[in-house]
UniProtKB/Swiss-Prot annotation:
This is Putative 2-aminoethylphosphonate transport system permease protein PhnU. Residues 68-275 form the ABC transmembrane type-1 domain. SUPFAM superfamilies: MetI-like. The keyword Transmembrane helix applies. The chain crosses the membrane at residues 19-39, 76-96, 111-131, 150-170, 202-222, 254-274. The keyword Membrane applies. GO terms for cellular component: plasma membrane.
Length: 286
């Protein structure tokens, strides 16, 4: 007669759930709860009811439409400038080494650690109305007014953001360029390929993931950049982060400020989704 022994169920291991609970609590406390407060404040109308009254009021405002267009224009032009300048400098530093190229690479790395207001302060000292360039030109050619006045415009903001965020493109791009097999470049040169063709058919496909990663990061940062626009004080240049600041701090209109901040968050998530879509279409893993 055989005995049938009951099978013992293994004890439930709760340790993985406990390890998961801690980061969820941190996210809920530091991110989801403040975000929910912003959403609740943005959707609460003047009568205290939840609705889209504030949203309709904001999107119908010409000031908001202008700030949205300025934000997108600055973000796209600054990102394009970062990609062009970062690509050119990375190609030179990696494939055309010269005395001091390593030092320049280290200086580029240090730019990432600098606060943005230091770059804008340097721009003010150089290109400002009483800066070094205008002072020199006015003393040499007896100009009555400063001849260089682009700094306090959208062009000045874009140039400052290109200077600040180009290293974010260069770091991953230079790392990717150093991984390219030099024998492929030598073979293309021996076969008589033009340098531009080598860049387009050999270097660019290998560097595309790094370009997309750096470009997407620049696009998100320039969309949400606040310090450069505020410090330069560009005339007539209002962006969504600047509008959030003015509504909350200067006008004490927290409901409208929260709604604009919520729209800015949705815009950033939309741009990031476009990047992920483009990355999946091109076969780039991210």
């Amino acid at each position: 007669m055989s005995l049938i022994l009951p099978l013992e169920k293994p004890a439930l291991n709760l340790r993985p759930l406990l390890w998961l609970l801690l980061p969820l609590l941190v996210l809920a406390t530091l991110f989801f709860w403040p975000l929910s407060l912003i959403v609740e404040q943005a959707l609460r109308g003047a009568n205290g009811e939840i609705g889209l009254e504030t949203f309709r009021h904001v999107v119908d405002s010409k000031r908001f439409v202008g700030a949205l267009l300025n934000t997108l224009q600055i973000a796209f032009f600054a990102t394009a400038g970062c990609l062009l300048l970062g690509s050119a400098m990375s190609l030179i530093l990696v494939f055309i080494p010269f005395p001091g190229s390593e030092l320049i690479g280290r200086v580029v790395d240090t730019f990432i650690a600098l606060p943005t207001f230091l770059i804008t302060l340097a721009f003010t000292f150089i290109y400002g109305s009483a800066g070094l360039l205008n002072g020199t030109l006015m003393s040499l050619f007896a100009f009555e007014l400063p001849p260089v006045d682009f700094l306090y415009s959208m062009q000045g903001v874009i140039l400052a953001e290109i200077t600040v965020f180009t290293p974010l493109v260069m770091r991953p791009l230079m790392a990717a360029l150093r991984q390219i097999d030099k024998s492929q470049l030598e073979a293309a040169s021996i076969l008589g390929a033009h340098p531009l063709r080598v860049i387009g058919q050999v270097i660019f496909p290998a560097a595309l993931p790094a370009l997309m990663a750096g470009g997407s990061l620049c696009l998100l940062l320039t969309t949400n950049e606040f310090g450069i626009v505020l410090f330069i004080g560009a005339k007539g240049v209002n962006t969504l982060p600047m509008m959030v600041y003015s509504k909350a701090i200067l006008e004490s209109d927290y409901t409208v400020a929260c709604m604009i901040a919520l729209i800015n968050i949705v815009l950033s998530l939309g741009l990031f989704s476009l990047y992920r879509l483009a990355a999946s279409r091109t076969g780039v893993r991210s």
